């Protein structure tokens, strides 16, 4: 098989829940990123053969949000698009599907990634077509039901984090320490301008005055400290350790990469950011979903012929500090190389986009450090994991 490479990678800044991006539809965010990828590569709109984007919360979003993104971005109307839902792994799974599409000759150039506006996800009145003759009638929160709820055990994702903490001996103190480190690393990276190259400035129209340009992650909590974290109440289990401070956020954003063969990149005069060395998807007990990166990373590393110790840089999504700690312990990799610019606890977790967001951040940091081998991995609600390795 020909080498498959990524030639461009970009994302929006991540918005907080109800924040700067709250009123911007997910396809608008994705379209801004796609336009930027074309600018970075200087390719014309009709050269892109396919678009594959993750989006988890699609209730009320209209048909095939990825297709909406494709049209809004100015790509040719002949360019097909696919929206996928692999929950938190959607954005990375989209890149895997892009590689497969190229490998089998279905497309030459694919844009893949994810988009999400969690703030805009609607409340839904189930059964409204038939009506409710008697009794209370309750609306459901589609964000929680479709994005954050374990349908198999009928509890919130936060309980799965508590399950992992209990099974793997992860204390509240360990969780808070990882969360604080994530905030500090993200703030330092932002101050140093490390996210500038990967972020696409996004213009937000205002009712009065000039548009606001949104270009910096707004969820990072610079006031976070050990005392404040320790003072937070457990969010899901009174005797547990998972809090609002050591869990990822509810966020909005988009990210995408451009994928093609190394031969095609050379023909177009494009320098690859990295080669996709391998990828893998795994399944496990839904109650322990936070451990998903372990089997997925093990499979991806084996397929690449690597060991965990060979990795120069790692982006392992921080759904919860509890599972992030447990995954680090289980894999035994060098934690000083993990999420060096902070993770989802600080930056945020727009679920359909996060898989590609961590890949974008990984690719740019690998360039900065001249790192040779990297991995991106996420746990997935429902009991799965995804991982993808990059070589430069």
Regions found by a protein language model. Give the residues of each.
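Condensing-enzyme catalytic core mediating Claisen C-C bond formation in acyl metabolism
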Residues: 1-24, 36, 226-291, 295, ...
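N-terminal extracellular/periplasmic Venus flytrap/periplasmic-binding protein-like
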Residues: 11-12, 22-32, 40, 174-267, ...
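Conserved catalytic cysteine-centered active-site region
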Residues: 55-109, 152-156, 223-249, 330-357, ...
């Amino acid at each position: 098989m020909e080498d498959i490479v990524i030639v461009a990678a970009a994302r929006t800044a991540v918005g907080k829940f109800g924040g700067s991006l709250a009123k911007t539809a997910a396809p608008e965010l994705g379209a801004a990123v796609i336009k930027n990828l074309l600018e970075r590569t200087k390719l014309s709109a009709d050269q892109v053969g396919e678009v594959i984007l993750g989006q988890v919360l699609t209730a009320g979003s209209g048909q095939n949000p990825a297709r909406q993104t494709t049209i809004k971005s100015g790509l040719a109307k002949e360019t097909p698009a696919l929206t996928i839902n692999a929950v938190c792994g959607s954005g990375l799974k989209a890149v895997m599907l892009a590689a497969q599409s190229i490998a089998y000759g279905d497309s030459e150039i694919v844009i893949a990634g994810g988009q999400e506006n969690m703030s805009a996800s609607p409340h839904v009145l189930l059964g409204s077509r038939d009506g409710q003759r008697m009794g209370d009638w309750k609306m459901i929160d589609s964000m929680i039901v479709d994005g954050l709820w374990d349908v198999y055990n009928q509890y919130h994702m936060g309980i799965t984090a508590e399950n992992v903490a209990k099974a793997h001996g992860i204390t509240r103190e360990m969780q808070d320490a990882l969360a604080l480190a994530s905030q500090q690393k993200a703030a330092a990276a932002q101050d140093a301008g490390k996210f500038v190259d990967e972020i696409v400035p996004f213009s937000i129209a205002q009712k009065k005055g000039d548009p606001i340009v949104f270009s910096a992650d707004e969820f990072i909590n610079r006031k976070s400290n050990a005392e404040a974290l320790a003072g937070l109440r457990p969010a899901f289990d009174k005797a547990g350790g998972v809090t609002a401070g050591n869990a990822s956020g509810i966020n909005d954003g988009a990210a995408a990469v451009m994928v093609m063969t190394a031969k095609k990149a050379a023909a177009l005069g494009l320098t690859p950011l990295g080669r996709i060395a391998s990828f893998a998807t795994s399944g496990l007990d839904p109650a322990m979903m936070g451990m998903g990166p372990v089997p997925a990373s093990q499979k991806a590393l084996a397929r690449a012929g690597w060991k965990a110790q060979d990795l120069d840089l790692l982006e392992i999504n921080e759904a919860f500090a509890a599972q992030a700690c447990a995954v680090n312990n289980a894999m035994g990799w060098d934690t000083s190389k993990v999420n060096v610019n902070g993770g989802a606890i600080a930056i945020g977790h727009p679920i359909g986009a996060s898989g590609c967001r961590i890949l974008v951040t990984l690719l740019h940091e690998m360039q900065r450090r001249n790192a040779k081998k990297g991995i991106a991995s996420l746990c997935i609600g429902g009991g799965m994991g995804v991982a993808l390795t990059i070589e430069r």
